[in-house]
Design a protein with these regions (language model features):
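Boundary at the C-terminal end of the N-terminal hydrophobic targeting segment
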Residues: 27-31
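Bacterial N-terminal signal peptides
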Residues: 11-22
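Edge beta-strand at a domain terminus
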Residues: 138-164
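Acidic, glycine-rich flexible loop segments
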Residues: 102-132, 136
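N-terminal glycine/threonine-rich, aromatic-flanked beta-hairpin/loop signature
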Residues: 58-100, 134
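Bacterial N-terminal signal peptides that target proteins for export
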Residues: 2-13
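Tryptophan-anchored aromatic micro-motifs
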Residues: 37-57, 89-91
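A short, structured loop/turn motif at beta-sheet edges
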Residues: 38-42, 68-72, 94-101, 126-136, ...
Length: 164
């Protein structure tokens, strides 16, 4: 038996197999990388908000607000209330149809002395304009006390533009 010849042939076969696997395009192929393509709702939005009479739609109070819609379905929210009377809002969003979204968020409210007044929960439906640079929203607002019990519900209407 010629052991060195067999070992030499085995080494050659292994070398050819390694070379074939390294040089073969399919052996090193990686999945095609897709460019990052966020939902068109993602971004920073400047809002004009009106708390409205739920029955008539008449504006009762207006204020400015800002939301950041994050990739992946979360959002951050703030408004023009004094920072000592309202905490930041956090929530989530989901796409419900073509340019249609459902949002919900929650923030804490404080008395002027710094004590907790309660919480506000907002649930709304947002329609994104076809150009992706403006939106409208209609929301139901839950005013809750410091123990998180529902006190009253209200309504809000929002128009927004993308911050550029």
């Amino acid at each position: 038996m010629n052991t060195p010849a067999i070992a030499s042939k085995a080494a050659a076969v292994v070398a050819i197999a390694i070379a074939a696997s390294v040089l073969s395009p399919s052996a090193n192929a990686q999945p095609a990388l897709r460019p990052f393509d966020p939902d068109p709702f993602v971004g920073v939005w400047l809002h004009d908000v009106a708390r409205v009479d739920c029955a008539s739609g008449t504006a009762l109070v207006t204020f400015k607000a800002m939301q950041m819609i994050h990739h992946g379905g979360t959002l951050s929210d703030t408004n023009s209330a004094a920072p000592t009377t309202r905490g930041p809002g956090f929530g989530d969003w989901e796409r419900t149809g073509d340019n249609q979204y459902a949002i919900k968020l929650r923030y804490a409210r404080y008395f002027a002395d710094g004590n907790l007044d309660g919480y506000t929960v907002v649930r709304g439906n947002t329609a994104l304009a076809t150009d992706g640079n403006s939106l409208t929203n209609s929301s139901r607002v839950e005013i809750r006390d410091a123990s998180d019990a529902l006190v009253v519900t209200a309504c809000a209407r929002t128009t927004g533009t993308r911050f550029k």
